[in-house]
Amino acid sequence: MDLVKQESKKKIGILGGTFDPAHRGHVSISKEAKKRFSLDKIIWAITKKNPFKGKSNLNLDKRIKYAKKINKNNLFIKVKYFENKVKSNRTIDLIKYIKRINKNAEIYFIMGADSLINFHKWKNSNLILSICHILVFDRDKYMAKSLNSVSYKKYSNKSIEFIRFKKVNISSSKLRKI
């Protein structure tokens, strides 16, 4: 009898955002997610505009180029822009698209604790939780807020994992002020 070699499921992380600009904090949480959850790759899905924030300072092309530049030695990180293919900037549409082209993959959506605060306002947030794991990384001043948020109270019994690790004291907002 032939033994059929069972292929293990591919594990794909998605870190979405404007990356305005990308920085070592994004790289650090990507490395930590890869290590803790044995992710095969992490896609940095760069969006033109965050629906919860104002206009980006850098144009899209510059943000993509810079994100690729800081990841030239991190071959597991793939910097992508999907909105022209997906025809949407909504996370649910991005996740469905990635699931469609990676049918058997397990998807891990990576976010900072600040993003969880408004997660209940995201389009189809309940559906997002049903089709992927959510990894919430600790972020200065936001962990307590996120644990007390409507989103956490609404979804705490779902697939949300909080990750505490050595913080990198940097943010895109701080960098833009320099």
Which positions does each model-derived feature cover?
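Nucleotidyltransferase catalytic core that binds NTPs
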Residues: 1-178
